[in-house]
C-alpha cells in the first residue's frame, strides 16, 4: 500500500510538473511575440523576427544592418561615419558630434553623424521603434525609402530637431512626412504633419509607429494616431533607416554651444498582415 501511495504521489507530481511546464511555455510564447503599440481593431499582425531587432548584443547585427548608408555620405556638411554607430546596454546608439575629419570628402566638415540601413527591403507592414531622440539640432530620424535612377519613394516616420536655441517649438515638433519623386520629370510630391508635444521630445522615451498597407499610411506616437493618408504612391519594397543629419536649409546648423548627442533606440519591431514580402537591399 505504501508503494502504491508513493507511486500515486510521483504520478501526481509529474502531472503537476507537466501542467506547470505547459503553462510556463504558453506564457513565454505570448511574451516572446509583442503586439504593436497602437489600436489593432480587427487586424491581425504577425511579428517577424528576421527583420526585427531588440539590440541585445554587444555589436550591430551585420546580417540585418549596414552601419552606414551604402548610397549616401550624409547631408552636408555632416558626414555619416560607421564609428558613430554602436550597440550598448540593450540599445542601438547613433551619435552626432562636432568633429573635423581630416580626409572628409569635399563639402563635409564640422559635424559627423550616423546612419543605419537594413540589408533587406520590405513591402507593407507595421514598423515601430522605442527611442529617445538626440538633444541636438543634428536630427533624429526613422524612415523608409527606396530609389533608382527614375524615382524615389520615401516615408518619414519621424524627423526630430532635438534642440534649437532660438526657436523653442522645433524640439517639440514631430515631423511625419511622405515623399514621392519622379527624377526624370523633376516631380516631387511631398506633404507632412507637424505633431506637437507640450515638452521637447528629447525629455522622454517615444514609441513611434507606422502602419503601411496597400490602401493607406497611418502614423502613431505612443499608440495615438497622429496622421492618416491614402496610399497613392508607396507600393515598392523599401529599406528601413535610422539616421542623424545636419539641416542647414531647414532649421539650421547646430549653435556654437550644441556639440551633438546620442539618438538611442531600444528596439525595432516589424509585423506583417500576411506572408511578409522581403527582398534583398539592392539599391545603388
Where are these regions (language model features)?
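Bacterial N-terminal signal peptides that target proteins for export
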Residues: 2-14
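GH16 jelly-roll
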Residues: 27-284
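C-terminal motif of bacterial Sec signal peptides marking the signal peptidase cleavage site
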Residues: 23-24
